[in-house]
Regions:
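Conserved ABC ATPase "signature" region
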Residues: 40-41, 78, 82, 89-107
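Catalytic Walker B motif of ABC-type/P-loop ATPase nucleotide-binding domains
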Residues: 136-139
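Conserved ABC ATPase signature
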Residues: 111-115, 119-121
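ABC ATPase NBD coupling module
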Residues: 42-59
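Short coil-to-helix segment of the ABC ATPase nucleotide-binding domain corresponding to the Q-loop/switch region
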Residues: 71-79
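Conserved ABC transporter NBD signature motif
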Residues: 33-41
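Helix-to-loop junction immediately C-terminal to a conserved catalytic motif
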Residues: 25
Length: 231
């Protein structure tokens, strides 16, 4: 994955998309192979080294905001900075600035239970951005949102990608989210089987598919293509 690139990971449920995301973010150790982030082999790092690399490089956005229920929006956003040793005063000031940027300045004191789904996701995005990550890993980031809020979140992603150079790797079933990416990778049964360009139709992946040959020279054919070939 290149710096500043936006990639969508598409494919049927159960194909391993969320597991892949956890492995790439260092939340799960792969059963085989290795994962490199910012030029470092994550599978060979100590626990502390992995935490430090993750804090400096990557942030996560999940379908549910995963906000701490007893902390207000400001404190939720400031929390990652506190973990990095930033003073509470500076962390809160930076959190206020980030929430203001995301249109949440009027809700900084609200607990998660007082926020709508879209507001919670904006707070989660602010928390993900507060450490100025080079890469954002997002697992179905708009899956729990209504169409209007989904479009607002997607517009925010586009702004961050185009103007701030933030890289995105997004697991999605959404046609709109996949269309935001520079390219899409199709995952089936734990293997990347094809690559798709911009504007992929996740409901018809056979339309513009380019098959992938792995490092062993093997091509894994998608099931629908096997049927068409008589396999």
């Amino acid at each position: 994955m290149k710096a500043g690139e936006a990639i969508a990971v598409v494919g049927p449920s159960g194909s391993g998309k969320s597991t892949l995301m956890k492995c790439l973010g260092g939340l799960m150790k792969p059963s085989a192979g290795s994962v490199s982030l910012a030029g470092k082999n994550m599978t060979r790092l100590t626990g502390q080294e992995l935490v430090e690399l993750r804090q400096k490089t990557v942030s996560f956005i999940f379908q549910e905001g995963n906000l701490l229920p007893d902390l207000n929006a400001r404190d939720n956003v400031a929390q990652p900075l506190r973990h990095q040793g930033v003073s509470s005063k500076k962390a809160l000031a930076l959190a206020d600035a980030m929430l203001d940027r995301l249109g949440m300045a009027h809700r900084v004191s609200a607990l998660p239970a007082m926020l709508s789904g879209g507001e919670q996701q904006r707070v989660a995005i602010a928390r993900a951005l507060i450490t100025q990550p080079r890469l954002i890993l997002a697992d179905e980031p708009t899956g729990a949102l209504d169409p209007v809020t989904s479009r607002e979140v997607l517009a925010l992603f586009k702004d961050l990608h185009q103007n701030d150079g933030v890289s995105f790797l997004i697991v999605t079933h959404s046609k709109e989210v996949a269309a935001f990416a520079n390219r899409s990778l199709e995952l089936r049964d734990g293997r990347f089987v094809a690559e798709h360009g911009e504007g992929v139709d996740v409901e018809n992946l056979s339309q513009d598919r380019e098959l992938i040959i792995d490092e062993t020279g093997t091509v894994t054919l998608p099931p629908d293509l096997l049927v068409r070939l008589g396999g």
